[in-house]
């Protein structure tokens, strides 16, 4: 063999010991079995083959290890080397995460595209997740030499962008006496900014820390969540609210609008920062997010317009990327979310979609010849889903100063054919507290968001009662009445189909008309208009109050008119005489929140008073 080939095809790297290597015995799709792996650990990261493909050990038997490889395994051969790294699959946490886009194992896609000049990720590419050469503005807190620090303490802030302050914390497993802290200035992620001494051993720290993705980051204690996650979608905020630190599932068939709801949450929710994981969905959806988000702006309380991308991190693992990395992408996303939670922020994590993640589990499980359970999914599917969702919650963070943070998980589920008895949907519903069920029939009627108000539920309504009492004491009663109207409409629909609308009692006709108002002009929302893409909570409350006020007044008028001689007040008469008020009720949604809260509340109050006056005049006329 010519020497040029000999130089290129060396089996071992010169600096590595031979004992660090195993060798490939079997390749089956993304699963590789390697021998000679004595001393390897579960979930240890390994490099497989001459291309240094990234893999993770998922089973150990004797000296052979089963490895799931996160890249395409075509071209791997028996006896190819497998290099052990002695560390678990970890993510890099530090300044520079926000506004970035990673793949499932935290490789920065933009950097790879620039370096390789290719539209696809080259195999075995090794690029650091965060740029180590960028300089960051480092501002230490009031700490000096001799001070004691413990895990989780915030010791500095870094200016990440004009929207987010990045708090630098000590890793959870570190502690000691400060022997050096860097003065304020510009530093890269390679520079030492803090040095601690503990039991005579000195340890230096940079602004960067690594954390294994399968291990939840420790917290001081878990707290009960009591603040609503305001999404800007009326049907979710008013009828089926979630909390900051809650768990939500959005199951629905194709074309029901799961991705649009996930994106609306990312754009308009009251979270401080958002981690959007595109897990096994179409690449075009991720491309759409990448095109939309940088152009989207959010208005801050001081009137500044800022790009939504400044508070967002994207983890893209589309359906044409290797299957095994889908499993890792969910863990990568939640670990990044926990990192921002530990700074005291409220974080939302969108997982779109957990079904694709479960399918990746099914494929790996099949390759390992494990006993399949329902629909071929592994028997531990529910346990894996639960261990992911339980990383959500509102917590008291480790270290000082005392602070609370939260991670809210919103998982989209794509059951085949919209069948909610699918194992992934069933397992998810037994875990999550909020269920936003999407309905294909509503989507076909172009009613968006297509959340079915008869099957959806939220178990957080009681936890949020104190918030609602403070915001508006009437809201809980109004919401109960609105739900009753929608339920009553569903009961009446069968009767209407049999005998027609005219045969109904006047009260039932009013119920049907109010339900139509609620359905078409309150629950339906147009995400592509400036006035309706985002609905503040005060607007949601006032719109519902006026619709229910109309319902109550109309019922009272009909009841009063029923027992009197002369002309009765009927539903037809109400609609004929008060047509202009009815039109104003329908048009409430067109009020633009950009006008400001005082202007909108004044308009809604005026309509409330006009409704009362209109019905009073109608009753006086018909006496």
Swiss-Prot record:
The family this protein is said to belong to: Belongs to the ATPase alpha/beta chains family.
Catalytic function, reaction form: ATP + H2O + 4 H(+)(in) = ADP + phosphate + 5 H(+)(out)
Listed InterPro entries: ATP-synt_VA_C, ATP-synth_a_Xtn, ATP_synth_asu-like_sf, ATPase_a/bsu_AS, ATPase_F1/V1/A1_a/bsu_N, ATPase_F1/V1/A1_a/bsu_N_sf, ATPase_F1/V1/A1_a/bsu_nucl-bd, ATPase_F1/V1_b/a_C
Enzyme class: translocase
Molecular function terms, GO-annotated: ATP binding; ATP hydrolysis activity; proton-transporting ATPase activity, rotational mechanism
Summary of subunit composition and partner proteins: V-ATPase is a heteromultimeric enzyme composed of a peripheral catalytic V1 complex (main components: subunits A, B, C, D, E, and F) attached to an integral membrane V0 proton pore complex (main component: the proteolipid protein).
One biological process term in Gene Ontology: ATP metabolic process
Annotated HAMAP family: ATP_synth_A_arch
Binding site for ATP: 252-259
Listed CDD domains: ATP-synt_V_A-type_alpha_C, ATP-synt_V_A-type_alpha_N, V_A-ATPase_A
EC number, as in UniProt: 7.1.2.2
Protein name from the UniProt record: V-type proton ATPase catalytic subunit A
PROSITE patterns (alphabetical): ATPASE_ALPHA_BETA
Alphabetical UniProt keywords: ATP-binding, Hydrogen ion transport, Ion transport, Nucleotide-binding, Translocase, Transport
């Amino acid at each position: 063999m010519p020497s040029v080939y000999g130089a290129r095809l060396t089996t071992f790297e010169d600096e590595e010991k031979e004992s660090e290597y195993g060798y490939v015995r079997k390749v089956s799709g993304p699963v590789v079995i390697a021998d000679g792996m004595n001393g390897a650990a579960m979930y240890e990261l390994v490099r497989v083959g001459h291309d240094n493909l990234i893999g993770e050990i998922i089973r150990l038997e004797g000296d052979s290890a089963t490895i799931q490889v996160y890249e395409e395994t075509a071209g791997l051969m028996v006896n190819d080397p497998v290099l052990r790294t002695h560390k678990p699959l970890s993510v890099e946490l530090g300044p520079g995460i926000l506004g970035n886009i990673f793949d499932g194992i935290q490789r920065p896609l933009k950097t790879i595209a620039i370096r390789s000049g290719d539209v696809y990720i080259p195999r075995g590419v090794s690029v650091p997740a965060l740029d180590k050469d960028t300089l960051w503005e480092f501002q230490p807190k009031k700490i000096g030499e001799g001070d004691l620090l413990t895990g989780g303490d915030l010791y500095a802030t870094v200016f990440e962008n004009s929207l987010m302050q990045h708090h630098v914390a000590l890793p959870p497993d570190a502690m000691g006496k400060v022997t050096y802290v860097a003065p304020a200035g510009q530093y890269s992620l390679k520079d030492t900014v803090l040095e601690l001494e503990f039991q005579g051993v000195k340890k230096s720290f940079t602004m960067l820390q690594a954390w294994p993705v399968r291990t939840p980051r420790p917290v001081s204690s878990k707290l009960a969540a009591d603040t609503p996650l305001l999404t800007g979608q009326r049907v979710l905020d008013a009828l089926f609210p979630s909390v900051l630190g809650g768990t939500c599932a959005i199951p629905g068939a194709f074309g029901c609008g799961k991705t649009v709801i996930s994106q609306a949450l990312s754009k308009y929710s009251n979270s401080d920062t958002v981690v959007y994981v595109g897990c096994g969905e179409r690449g075009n959806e991720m491309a759409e997010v990448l095109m939309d988000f940088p152009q989207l702006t959010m208005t801050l309380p001081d009137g500044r317009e800022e790009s939504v991308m400044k508070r967002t991190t994207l983890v893209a693992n589309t359906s044409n990327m290797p299957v095994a990395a889908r499993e890792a992408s969910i863990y990568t996303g939640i670990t990044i979310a926990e990192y921002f939670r530990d700074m005291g922020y409220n974080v939302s994590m969108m997982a779109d979609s957990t079904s694709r993640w479960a399918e990746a589990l099914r494929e790996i499980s099949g390759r390992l010849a494990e006993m399949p359970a329902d629909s071929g999914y592994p028997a531990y599917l529910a346990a894996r889903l639960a261990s992911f969702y339980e990383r959500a919650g509102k917590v008291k963070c480790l270290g000082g100063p005392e602070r609370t943070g939260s991670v809210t998980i919103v998982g989209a589920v794509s059951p085949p054919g919209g069948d909610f008895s699918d194992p992934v949907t069933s397992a998810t519903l037994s875990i999550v507290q909020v269920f936003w069920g999407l309905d294909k029939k509503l989507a076909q009627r172009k009613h968006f968001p297509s959340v079915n108000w008869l099957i959806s539920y939220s178990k957080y309504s009681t936890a949020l009662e104190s918030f609602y009492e403070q915001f508006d004491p009437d809201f809980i009663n109004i919401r109960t009445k609105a739900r009753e109207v929608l339920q009553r409409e569903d009961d009446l629909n069968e009767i209407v189909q049999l005998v027609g609308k005219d045969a109904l009692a006047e009260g039932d006709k009013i119920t049907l008309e109010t339900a139509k108002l609620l359905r078409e002009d309150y629950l339906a929302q147009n995400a592509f208009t400036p006035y309706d893409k985002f609905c503040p909570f005060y607007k949601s409350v006032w719109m519902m109050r006026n619709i229910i006020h109309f319902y109550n007044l109309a019922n009272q008028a009909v009841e009063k008119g029923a027992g009197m001689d002369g002309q009765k007040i009927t539903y037809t008469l109400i609609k004929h005489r008060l047509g202009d008020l009815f039109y104003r009720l329908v048009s409430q949604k067109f009020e633009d929140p950009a006008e400001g809260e005082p202007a909108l509340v004044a308009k809604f109050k005026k309509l409330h008073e006009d409704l009362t006056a209109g019905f009073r005049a109608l009753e006086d006329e018909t006496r």
